[in-house]
Amino acid sequence: MLKALYDYGLRRQLTLPPGFIGKTVKAYISLSENDDRVSIYLGDDELLPCPDMGSLAQGRDKCNVLVEKRSIVIPDAPADGAKPAAKSAFFLETLRDASEEEPLLKVCVRALETPEITEAIRAELDRMKIKPGDRISFRVNGNSMVESEKIRRWWREYRKRFAKGDASSAKLCLITGEPTAPMMTTIPIQGLLLSLIHISEPTRP
């Protein structure tokens, strides 16, 4: 019964698949396969299904994939010889892995690995007043990487390694049957009180 209800919700886009959560994106780093020009494309208030690491992103060496804070995706220029922060290194590592499924991500990887392009991105983000805590992502050839079905397919497989690596905290989802890390807290349900009030109102003649 629960599985049938869940599948119905997925088909009707009433819920998100395991490993995804709705997020807004403040800005996109817009890149092209044809040249090294950089521009910033502002996002909006639309909630997009984004890969979500859950509580693992709160640790020291992991972060969310594809959509993260500017301070992680494009950190301040490191001092000479300094290694990138662990979270920034992990973000780049996941992009490399995902680029095997979605080749357009290779453009993003190259940009983050090229100091001149990274500095141009940093300057454009500053010009557009994108703050360190704002969530950002990528567009390549005008295509939002957040909406790439290839990346979503990659993420569904990639995320399984974290459940396997931490078997002590992994539990089976009652609906999907997949191993998952249980949420320590849940997102508040919006609009429920209003709906209940509306339902409980007496019928007026």
Question: Where are the regions that the model predicts?
Answer:
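Short cysteine-rich clusters marking metal-coordination/redox-active sites
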Residues: 173-176
